[in-house]
Structure formats: structure tokens, C-alpha cells
């Protein structure tokens, strides 16, 4: 079962801690779509708590948003009850049988396309997206804290290191849901719309350079923001790798929950040791503000 369907998964906590999309991203998406008057139908695949449908729906007559997680759909309906042109339903990108042929003007997927089973998804999208309609997939992978190489190395180790990351403590690597995570880390390089049915294919990718820390311009490196270390800590706890680790270590609780610590607590212990200026803040280290940038991709295509 996917992490998002487990009883231990909190849709509300996930939604609260995840980074938001900048306006520049939606400007890029709608600039490619290039229809000025609100008309037609938007299909939001893997809608989560409904952010994409909310932001894009003003350019459409109606929006249909689907997600496999019942908890996410309930949260989306509660959060966006006033957006009457959006309809939310539980569903999968692999089964769009509820939609007529050529009924969709844009199919969008924000931070969801790495989960898709493409041998099933491409035929469905080719059927429901009308000729001249658009496809827009985008997402983000691992972030870095700009100017903090040692913290980034520890973050990488705890997320993807093999075996034990501390004596007697295994990292999160084996608990990521694969192949989805690997597809995302590769920025969907191998996800290719069939050229027999799609054209005007465009990719915008940004792979974070952990060594030089050179940051691209805002169109390419569009997922960049300031956040506190406390917000970064909460974000890490939304990772599917973290959720999988917790499900495998039911005896572990975070210190915030009265336990002796979980994998994220242990990781930040190491990060604070590596960043003395942060450690000097004592219990107030979570208030420290840092700048972060994510590796990102945008994949755009037009139905022939």
C-alpha cells in the first residue's frame, strides 16, 4: 500500500509542511497553454490537497481534480469548498474512464507524475485530451540549504545513505517508494510523451549543484525560498521515506511527541554538530532562517 493510503499518514500535516508553488511557475504553465479566455476543462492528476486546481482553475470553465488518497480528497474538499467550479473525486491517472474522449483542455500534475504507470497513463491521456490541448507535469526533488555544505551532506546521508547512518540506526534510503522516488530524482528524464500523439514537447529542468552551489535564474530554479530550520524539519517529516521508516520502527517517537527521538531528530543532532553557529542558539535553533533551493522539472506537451 502507498504511504498516502496508510492509517498513519496525515494529509493535513503533509499539506501544512510542503513548500508552496510560486506564481512564476503557473505563469510558465499558462503561457504554454496560451488561451486567454476562461473556457474548457482542466484535469488535475494527483491533486493532493487541491493547490494546483485552485491556482489554475480561473483560466477554465471547470476543473476536475483526482487523487488516489481518500484523505487528500477529503482535505481538498474541506479546504476549497468555496471553489464551486472544482470537483474533487478519488481516482487514478491510469483510469480516466469517467471522462469522454477529447473532453480535457489541459491535464496537469504537480509533484505527482513520478508515481504514474505510463503504459496505462499515456493511452488514457491521449484519449481524453482534445487535439490542441496541453499536458503540464512538474515537480521538485531534494533541496539544499544554500551555503551549508556540511548540513547538506548529512541530509543526503540520512535520506539516501546505505546501511547504518549512525551506530545501530539505519537511514531512510530503503523506505522510499520506488521506482517513483528514483524517477523523481532523475527529474523524469525517461518520461517521454509518445511523439505519435504529442508534439511541441518542452522541458525545463534544474538540477541542484551541491558542489558549486551556483543558483540559476528564477525561470529555471523556480522552487527557491527562505524557511526556518523548524520548517525544514517539518518538511522532512512529510517524506515518504520518513513515513516508511517510522512504520518500520513503531517503538520510535519524535522528541516533540515525548519519545527518545526518531530518524529526523537524530539527523538534526548531527547537523547541529556540523554547524556550530546553529548549535550556539540552543533550543532556539528551529527559529534560524536559511535559504533553500530544490531541483525541479517542468514537462509540457501539446496533443496532436
Residue spans for each PLM region:
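A short SAM/SAH-binding and catalytic strip from SAM-dependent methyltransferases
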Residues: 105-119
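Conserved catalytic/acceptor-binding region of the Class I
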Residues: 132-226
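Conserved alpha-helix/loop element of class I SAM-dependent methyltransferases that forms part
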Residues: 19-40
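Conserved Class I S-adenosyl-L-methionine
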Residues: 187-304
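Class I SAM-dependent methyltransferase SAM/SAH-binding core
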Residues: 41-96
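A short acidic, Gly/Pro-enriched loop at the edge of an enzyme's catalytic core
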Residues: 97-107
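Class I SAM-dependent methyltransferase Rossmann-like catalytic core
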Residues: 7-19
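A short glycine-rich, Lys/Arg-flanked "PGG" loop and its adjoining helix->strand segment in the class I
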Residues: 120-132
